Amino acid sequence: MCGVVGIYHPDGELAPRLAYYSLFSLQHRGQESAGIASFDNHIRQKRGMGLVTEVFNDEDFELLAGKSVIGHVRYSTTGRSRLENAQPFVVKSKAGYIAVAHNGNLVNYSQLRNELENEGRVFTTDSDTEVISQLLSKFLIEEGDIINALERLNESLVGSYTMTMLVDDAVIGYRDPLGFKPLCVGRIDDGYVICSESCAIDALGGEFIRDVQPGKAAIIKDGELEFVKIAKSERRAVCIFEYIYFARPDSIIDGISVYKARSEMGKVLARESPVEADFVSAVPDSGITAAIGYAQESGLPYFEGLIKNRYVGRTFIMPVQSLRETSVRLKVNVVRENVRGRRVVLVDDSIVRGTTSRRIVQMIKDAGAKEVHMRIGSPPIIAPCYFGIDMKSREELIAASHTVEEIGRIFGTDSLAYLSLEGLLEAVRRAGGKRGYCLACLTSKYPVSVPGEECEC
């Protein structure tokens, strides 16, 4: 999962700073690298490994001055975690200057790369975004028109692809026809922002305009915003994990408050899996909203049982298991005064590998808790994701090879319960959701054809 940004602002000195602030607001979507590309007669770029605040300084904004800007924060799915895979990707061709920032993952990456290499194109990275950049360049040369080039690009790609792009001074945002990853547009003074989540618009003091609908592009050219249909969107497969974990709670995605959705997940979970206990607590930060919902519905008080060290990154999006193990030990500490001698309901948003959950339960027990009852605000994750979440194989997913009872014994809980799939969908409906979610990691049924997997397409 990554975060993408596109900015147009008539003040070319301000535009790259707005991109920086937007990326800072989307830092939760990727912490490995960050990059900004701007256009002012030609494309200038700065990319680096690390957090947004570690990559950029004031001198960079002078270098990046330009009215049209895109940006990216990354965590890797296709392509290793190294500088050459940091985005945006820039291409200079007969079609002009192109830059691409991509959130998603291509299922047919290898096939497309082989075809382009057979045509004589040279690749310098193992990122699927470089494939997208090369294809866009090829189609722009052949078509001479942005809309036609985007139509051909869409016909070529299989998987998830929400993107912001620079084609010379035009800023473009595009969302694939299934709408896997979010994208929205806002107004800032006399300019515009295109971004992965509405929280970035709020951070800039902007005005939300609308979500980019699946299969449509938002194109900003000469200061004018236009929405253009690129492909039919007959069905949707919005990533359910946006509402469970990835998105910031203060964001609104496709008209659904992420906070409301998570709160409803907690409430439905309390109805499905009640337990006698003294208080409800959360695994911070992503489990807090569901835990509050659980407490409200159950009538139990809510207390902090764990305190998070906010200078440690999100363990799930760290690329190497050994780093996740170390990060858990540094990430949270137990409030012994609250848990000692008491029965705790511990709520988390999800369990992927189980690294964090197992250690946290042990920490709470070691601190003197009488009982620990774990409640999970989503169903068991049993299948890999091929669309941009770092869950590559069933072997790394604890629920793919263990029953709920077995997982509870591994964690050392007194009880463990997950939200049902029906309960999850009910919660999203209560928050305003209507239709069309990708549930593949929970059901093993995929919305597009993936070799070796069952398809609902």
UniProtKB/Swiss-Prot annotation:
CDD domains documented for this protein: GPATase_N (cd00715), PRTases_typeI (cd06223)
Signal sequence coordinates: none
GO molecular function, one term: 4 iron, 4 sulfur cluster binding
Active site per UniProt: C2
Residue positions binding [4Fe-4S] cluster: C239, C385, C438, C441
InterPro entries in UniProt: GATase_2_dom, Ntn_hydrolases_N, PRibTrfase_dom, PRTase-like, PurF, PurF_N
PROSITE patterns: GATASE_TYPE_2, PUR_PYR_PR_TRANSFER
Reaction catalyzed: 5-phospho-beta-D-ribosylamine + L-glutamate + diphosphate = 5-phospho-alpha-D-ribose 1-diphosphate + L-glutamine + H2O
Domain of life: Archaea
Function recorded in the entry: Catalyzes the formation of phosphoribosylamine from phosphoribosylpyrophosphate (PRPP) and glutamine.
Protein name (database record): Amidophosphoribosyltransferase
Organism, as annotated: Archaeoglobus fulgidus (strain ATCC 49558 / DSM 4304 / JCM 9628 / NBRC 100126 / VC-16)
Organism ancestry: Archaea, Methanobacteriati, Methanobacteriota, Archaeoglobi, Archaeoglobales
